[in-house]
């Protein structure tokens, strides 16, 4: 019968394998994060372009598309580096399924851009299409990161993933407000969606700050200083208090987009800090677990050497 020690050794080996997977996927997570950030900006510029009836923002949108395409190539290279021939665990099966779905979304992106460029779609449909693609990419991150048993790492993972989701709600807020200002008129459905995006991002960010380290919380406090958020809050009040059918100043489009972008860019810096902290925790835990495993294996070797052998 196998001893308790043999199962402890197996548990440590399994934990190390999970931590190694998490460490190896950090490059993939970083590449996806950069692409998502670019697509969020592309979505906002697309809505400015559509809301202005194609009269403005065309050049800015195309420049952002080019940047997104370069970052998409980085993500696809990261996907290509994954070993799809190795024996599949349940985790890798789910991860590869998420990647397949994300690649389908990326393959449809040129057609989405074409429809936006030709103004075949409205702003609401465009926001939804980009949101589906971004959610597919974030699902890859969620699955890639879901491989840790250590409670500290798990807590940081929950904080990190909630932050990513909160940032996506901030991106949808930017896109929806961009369309409203560019169109110059408030409508009920868009206003309700805007309120939903604001409330949802605040909820996700609260979960993140509740679980994050003191260093991350301090970074977030700095990003939330009144002088940083005042322009955004002022523009939010305009959008949230203008009655349905009321006129919006299209000249505020640039100010809104810039205020949201400063906020989201600051969030990207915090996202990078969260990812770096998570990677550091993973490395520390990997080193400690490797030492524990080595000690257990020495113990097992000593026990084996001490057993009497048969004389026949």
Identify the meaning behind each predicted range.
Residues 1-312:
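Hydrophobic alpha-helical segments
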């Amino acid at each position: 019968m196998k001893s308790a020690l043999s199962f402890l050794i197996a548990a440590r080996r399994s934990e190390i394998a999970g931590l190694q997977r998490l460490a190896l996927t950090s490059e993939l997570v970083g590449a996806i994060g950069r692409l998502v950030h670019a697509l969020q900006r592309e979505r906002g510029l697309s809505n400015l372009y559509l809301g202005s009836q194609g009269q403005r923002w065309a050049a800015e949108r195309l420049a952002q598309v080019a940047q997104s395409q370069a970052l998409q190539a980085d993500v696809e290279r990261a996907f290509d580096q994954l070993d799809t021939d190795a024996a599949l665990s349940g985790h890798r099966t789910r991860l590869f399924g998420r990647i397949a779905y994300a690649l389908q979304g990326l393959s449809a992106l040129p057609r989405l851009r074409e429809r936006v460029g030709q103004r075949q779609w409205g702003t609401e449909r465009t926001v939804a299409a980009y949101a589906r693609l971004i959610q597919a990419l974030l699902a890859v991150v969620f699955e890639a990161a879901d491989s840790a048993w250590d409670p500290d790492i798990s807590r940081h993972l929950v904080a990190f993933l909630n932050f990513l989701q909160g940032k996506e709600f901030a991106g949808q807020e930017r896109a929806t407000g961009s369309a409203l200002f560019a169109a110059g008129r408030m409508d009920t459905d868009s206003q309700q969606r805007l309120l939903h995006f604001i409330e949802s991002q605040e909820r996700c960010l609260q979960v993140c700050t509740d679980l994050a380290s003191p260093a991350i919380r301090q970074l977030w406090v700095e990003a939330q200083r009144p002088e940083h958020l005042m322009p955004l809050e002022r523009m939010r009040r305009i959008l949230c208090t203008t009655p349905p059918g009321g006129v919006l100043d299209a000249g505020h489009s640039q100010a809104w987009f810039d205020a949201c972008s400063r906020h989201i860019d600051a969030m990207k810096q915090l996202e990078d800090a969260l990812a770096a902290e998570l990677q550091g925790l993973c490395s520390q835990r990997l080193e400690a677990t490797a030492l524990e495993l080595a000690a257990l294996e020495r113990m097992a070797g000593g026990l084996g050497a001490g057993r009497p052998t048969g004389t026949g």
